[in-house]
Amino acid sequence: MQLNPSEISELLKSRIEGLGASADIRTQGTVVSVTDGITRIHGLSDVMQGEMLEFPNNVFGVALNLERDSVGAVILGDYTGVSEGDQVKTTGRILEVPVGPELKGRVVNTLGVPIDGKGPIDTKETDIIEKVAPGVIARRSVSQPLQTGIKAIDSMVPIGRGQRELIIGDRQTGKTAVAVDTIISQKGKGVTCVYVAIGQKASTINNVVRKLEEHGAMEYTIVVAASASDSAAMQYLAAYAGCTMGEYFRDRGEDALIIYDDLTKQAWAYRQVSLLLRRPPGREAYPGDVFYLHSRLLERAARVNEEYVEKFTNGAVKGKTGSLTALPIIETQAGDVSAFVPTNVISITDGQIFLETDLFNAGVRPAINAGISVSRVGGAAQTKVIKKLSGGIRTDLAQYRELAAFAQFASDLDDATRRQLERGKRVVELLKQPQYQPLQVWELAVTLYTVNNGYLDDVDVAQVLAFEKSLKDQLKAKHAALIQRIEDTKELSKDDEAELAAAIQDFKKHGAF
């Protein structure tokens, strides 16, 4: 066999041209200083804002400050192994976390690494944690209810899917309890929940996870935990990581609920990082962009339209809207809602639920102040039967609060005022609710109907909750079809109303409570 030299050279040329080898060009820099998880790096000329940086021993950081001759970065995780003179490489990637249904039922840290001891999570996709919120055209108005199962909220401060509703109050007023009850209430409703714990004690987070497991809620819940022992950077980024995990479901035409517990501690962590990066402090020593810190996070909670979902899924999901509902929690100091961070978040959200220490200590739990709690968009999403029945309860409460103040000084009251005070006392008593016992729609409808129509006016205040419980037990036993109709149609027809009235009257005559 004779080889032609020209053929050999042509063959070699074609083989060399076919090699698609490209040089992996990555900038390398040197650590100049390390302080409290913040490092300054010299020599990184083409790094991006928010880019992941690779340190020795498989430690990663995020570039936050891009200055003329150095880069300020936060180290994610343990920074004790990073020292002056270490080589740092750029990765060309923005910080991202694993997303997908595989995360349900698991407890992960800010980076999506499991910390519950149940082994690795086999997720198929990752997504960046900092994303632009959906535009105005991509959104749909809030029109579907998100039942919390809490009487005071569902009747007077209704929440819709895609809404941002702030839970605000001092420490130890039951803020987390409201959030956990809301998660438990989503069982069987097709809502994926994400609970983001920021700066909480590890024991507190463990208690929440245990309660969710006890009530079968972990199967549709993802817990993102950045405890008080984690670095400030991990606490500051946890909320964005959790939001990305929730957006995965929203963008695929599903409904998700995210709870940030709490954004006060996230703001503290961001303040700490900013001051260590030597950014100029502003009011209360917060950096100038602390409003943007929360607004860009909470704007990502939205209800998106069918076109957005169809485009995002490349036509795989059609005719479905997706939603991400946010319940941020803010802790106030001595009831001061006019502080910097509370006023910021109040202005960003679509309403707020105020929890008061005085009410909590008086035994009114959940300690919701109905007078100053408001839902700006939830009214349009409220269930028909609840909307019809809840109008009177807010009026009764408002008049009761007003009259109760005068009644302290007035010795003799006319009959109308006395009746109003008695009705108000029963409404306050009826809105009390034990923890971990969220109500279904029919239960709330029956409760509201009973108080609105005066069936409780002659029941002793101390017996109101016992009356309510016994009445529901009797309805379950004798009027299961009525309950099912109210639950299915979310309406109270004239026939159903007549049957309910007869059932309550019968219970008052023969029932034991």
From Swiss-Prot:
Reactions mediated catalytically: ATP + H2O + 4 H(+)(in) = ADP + phosphate + 5 H(+)(out)
Binding site for ATP: G169, D170, R171, Q172, T173, G174, K175, T176
Alphabetical list of CDD domains matching this protein: ATP-synt_F1_alpha_C, ATP-synt_F1_alpha_N, F1-ATPase_alpha_CD
UniProt membrane topology term: Peripheral membrane protein
Main localization of the protein described in the UniProt heading: membrane
PROSITE patterns in alphabetical order: ATPASE_ALPHA_BETA
Gene Ontology CC, one term: plasma membrane
UniProt entry tagged with the keyword Oxidoreductase: no
Origin superkingdom: Bacteria
Pfam families: ATP-synt_ab, ATP-synt_ab_C, ATP-synt_ab_N
Keyword ATP-binding annotated: yes
EC number of this enzyme: 7.1.2.2
EC class: translocase
NCBIfam families documented for this protein: atpA, PRK13343.1
Entry function: Produces ATP from ADP in the presence of a proton gradient across the membrane. The alpha chain is a regulatory subunit.
HAMAP family reported in the protein's UniProt record: ATP_synth_alpha_bact
The protein, known as: ATP synthase subunit alpha
Name of the encoding gene: atpA
